[in-house]
C-alpha cells in the first residue's frame, strides 16, 4: 500500500520541550487511520505539524496530497463570531475565491448540497452560536466536504457529540475512504478505533507502533505507551527517556 504521508525523524517542540520526538512512520493512502495515545502524547501537535502550524519542527514530512482539509477541536473555534451556517460552510472554498473574490454559482450550489449531506437543511441562515455542539460539528464536516481534499485531518471530531451525530459523521468518513481519500483522525475511544479504523498510529510523544489496528492496540503496546508517557512526564527535557515496564 502506498503512503500518503511519510514522517522521518520528526520532532516538534514547544519552548524546547519535545511534544513529538524522533517520529518515523508512514500513513497509508486512501485509508482511515486513527492516531491514539495517552493524554499529552502529542496527537494534536502531530496534526498541526503536518499543516506547518506547529513551531520548531525538525525532520522530514513528505505528503502526496494536493489539497488538505483540517478540522480542529471545537474548543479552538470562536463561535461568538456573527456568521451563518451557510457562510461558515462556504469558507471551505476560501482558497479558491479568497478575501476579495466572489463565490461562484457552483460554490453556492455545492455549499447547499454539503449542508443537506450533513442533515442540516433549513439551518442555512441560522447563526452558528445558536447551534448545539452536535449541530455545529455537522456544519464543520460540511465545510470539510466543500474543500474536496485528498487528505482529511480531524482532531477529536466526536468529543461531546451525541451518538446519532457520531454515526452520521462516520458515514461521511467511510464515504471519503470509498472515494480513495486519506483520513487521519485523532481519537480517544479505543473501542471505536478497533471497530471502525483499519489502521492506527499509537503515539506517546515517540512512536509506539503503527500499522493494522489489531496489532497496534495490543495490550502490550498500550502498556508500553502508558509507561512511555509517564516517563516523559518525569523527564520532559531529556532526549532519551528511560521506560520501565511492570512485570
What are these regions, as identified by a protein language model?
Residues 187-188:
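H-loop/switch region of ABC-family ATPase nucleotide-binding domains
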Residues 51:
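Helix-to-loop junction immediately C-terminal to a conserved catalytic motif
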Residues 105-123:
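Conserved ABC ATPase "signature" region
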Residues 214-247:
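ABC ATPase nucleotide-binding domains
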Residues 197-213:
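H-loop (His-switch) and adjacent beta-strand-loop-beta switch element
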Residues 127-131:
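Conserved ABC ATPase signature
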Residues 152-156:
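Catalytic Walker B motif of ABC-type/P-loop ATPase nucleotide-binding domains
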